[in-house]
């Protein structure tokens, strides 16, 4: 059987890694050993941050809802409690978009949540 030197295969692999390392700084972009490490680390960061992005956006929506609810005299936790008791099922993303782009509609939702809360809880806020 003929001897296979794998020059074409390794060249293709190296090109693939260097293409992924395009835009990196220093030897990370053109030295295959260092570029390979940098690309692998970048993929690890990408995997981790795809998970973190979901947490970060949920946290952002909650912060926005808390600020918007406080403008109407409720806290975030009381707003969510009131929505649950009123049977209003809207996710936090939609609520925060409503608070930003449709303040009048958000105010109506807050009023429904406030009406569903017990009287002393609504007065305390």
Curated annotation (Swiss-Prot):
GO molecular function, one term: rRNA binding
Transmembrane segments: none
Signal sequence range: none
Function according to Swiss-Prot or TrEMBL: Binds directly to 23S ribosomal RNA and is necessary for the in vitro assembly process of the 50S ribosomal subunit. It is not involved in the protein synthesizing functions of that subunit.
Family: Belongs to the bacterial ribosomal protein bL20 family.
UniProt keywords, alphabetically: Ribonucleoprotein, Ribosomal protein, RNA-binding, rRNA-binding
Pfam families: Ribosomal_L20
Gene Ontology CC annotations of this record: ribonucleoprotein complex; ribosome
NCBIfam families: rplT_bact
Species, as recorded: Methylobacterium sp. (strain 4-46)
Protein name: Large ribosomal subunit protein bL20
Top-level division of the source organism's lineage: Bacteria
GO biological process: ribosomal large subunit assembly; translation
Classification via PROSITE patterns: RIBOSOMAL_L20
InterPro entries reported in the protein's UniProt record: Ribosomal_bL20, RIBOSOMAL_L20_CS, Ribosomal_protein_bL20_C
């Amino acid at each position: 059987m003929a001897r296979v030197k794998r020059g074409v295969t390794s060249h293709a692999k190296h090109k693939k890694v260097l293409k992924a390392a395009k835009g990196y700084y220093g030897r990370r972009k053109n030295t295959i050993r260092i570029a390979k490490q940098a690309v692998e680390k970048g993929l690890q960061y990408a995997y981790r941050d795809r998970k973190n992005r979901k947490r970060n956006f949920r946290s952002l929506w909650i912060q926005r809802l808390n600020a918007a609810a406080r403008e109407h005299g409720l806290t975030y936790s009381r707003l969510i409690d009131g929505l649950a008791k009123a049977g209003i099922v809207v996710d936090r993303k939609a609520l925060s978009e409503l608070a930003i782009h449709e303040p009048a509609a958000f105010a109506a939702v807050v009023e429904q949540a406030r009406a569903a809360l017990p009287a002393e809880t609504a007065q305390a806020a």
